[in-house]
Amino acid sequence: MTAIYKKELKSYLTSMIGYLFMAFTLALFGRYFTAINLQQGYPEIGYALQNSAFILLIAVPVLTMRVLSEEQKNKTDQLLLTAPVKISDIILGKYLALLTIYVIPVLIMCLYPLLLGTHGTVSYAVSYTSILGYFLLGAAYISVGVFVSSITESQVIAAVVGFVILFLCYVESGIANFFPEGAGSSFFAFFIIIALVCLWIGSMIKNPIITGVIAVIGEGALTTVYFTKSTLLEGKIQDLLGVFNMAGHMDNFVNGILDIGGVVYYLSVIAICTFLAMQSLQKKRWN
C-alpha cells in the first residue's frame, strides 16, 4: 500500500491537477473568508467554510476522475490486478494519496482562526470544529469519487457522474420536497429502488435465480407492509433521502458541536464507498 500511495501522490504533485485543486479550494474559501470574516467582522470561520464547500462538488470529481479510470484506459490496471498486492491496498493507497492532497489546503485553513485572533476574540473551539466537519465532508466526497472512477475507464464520465451524484446529495432537501409524505409515494419510490438494487446485484453475481428470489422477497415484503400497515411507510422516502444529505451533517460542526453521529456518518460513507470500489476492482480481477 505504501508504494501505491507514494506513486499516486507523486503523480498528483508532479502534474497540475493537484495544485489546481488546492488553488481553487483556497481561492474560493478566501473569498468567503474576506466577505464574512474580514468585512463583516464575524469571529468564526464556519460559515465561510460552509459557503465555500460547494466548490468541492466540482473540484473533487475533477481530482478523482483519473485515479482508477486512467489505469483502466491505459490497461495498466492489469499490472495492478496481477501483482501480489491486495485489492484493499490498491484502493486505500490511492484514496489516502487523494486525501493527502485535500489535507494540504485544509491545514492552511487552520491558520485563518489564528489570523482572526490577532484582530479580536475568536472561539478557536468553534472554528476548528468547523474545519473538522469540512475535512470529513471532503473526505466523504473523495471516497464517492474513487468509487465512481472504479466503474468506468473514461475520465470525463467519471467526473460528470461524480459531480451529478454529489450535486444530487447537495440538493437532497429540495428533492425530498417533491415527494408527498403519504404512504403511496413511499411505496412507489421504494418499489423502484428495490428493482434497481436487484438489477445491480444481478449484474454483480450473474445469477438470475438468486437475483429473482431477492427481488420477490424484497418487493413482496414491501407490498405486504403497504397493504397491512401503510402508516409505516409515511414520510419514509424523505427519511431515506435524508441519509444522502452529506452537506447537512456539517451544520452541527459549523455551530461548534462535535457531532459524534456526524463523524460516524462520514466514516460510514467512506467505508461503504471504498468497499464498493474494492468490489468493483475485485470483479475486474476475476474477469
Model-derived regions: residue spans:
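Hydrophobic alpha-helical transmembrane segments
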Residues: 1-71, 99, 111, 127-132, 159-160, 200-215, 222-236, ...
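Helix-capping/transition residues at the boundaries of transmembrane alpha-helices
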Residues: 11, 69, 80-82, 141, ...
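Transmembrane helix segments
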Residues: 32-35, 155-252
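Secretory targeting signals
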Residues: 29-36, 40-55, 97-164, 170-181
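Alpha-helix N-cap/helix-start motif at helix boundaries, enriched for small hydrophobics
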Residues: 88-92, 148, 281
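Helix-loop-helix units of permease transmembrane domains in multi-pass membrane transporters
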Residues: 67-97
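Alpha-helical transmembrane segments of polytopic membrane proteins
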Residues: 50-53, 130-137, 183-194, 213, ...
